[in-house]
């Protein structure tokens, strides 16, 4: 009987070790991980605070290129319809893209803006149909100011956020987004023109937007 109990105990311990090992493997290999080493020409997804974004959350994406340029995307087109226009803020689904150059200072990536473009959708249904009611494109001849930048934290991971008073670290009181691997986007449009070609202009929705804007 003693041998039987001892044998069962060994089996139980083995099972526990296997389960814990599988959980550790999943966390390290399968689950998204915070970015600790930025690789060039790789798109990273940025989750609000320190969490990987769920399907219906707004998020940023960023890619640094070997030629000293970057592409940044803000995708706020994934929320449910009832989550737009909350408290009368007039928000609608939109996607913005930022193009520019970067400089590495003290391990941080300082961003300069050269071009910005974006689209707006009437509602969630329009997002699914890729029909927009507004498109804009702005160029910054002398380089625009990007207040936000990518910081290397004391923990050794990177995040997209706003500088504190020293300018060397991020402001923990402002919004910030951890960079994660496992991005659901692997390639950005190569230019604002290519970005615009992904969508169709909904003329009726555009007229409604202009009429509402002029009231």
Residue ranges and their predicted role:
Residues 2-14, 19-99, 112-215:
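Lipid interaction determinants
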Residues 100-104, 109:
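Mid-length scaffold segments of soluble, non-membrane domains
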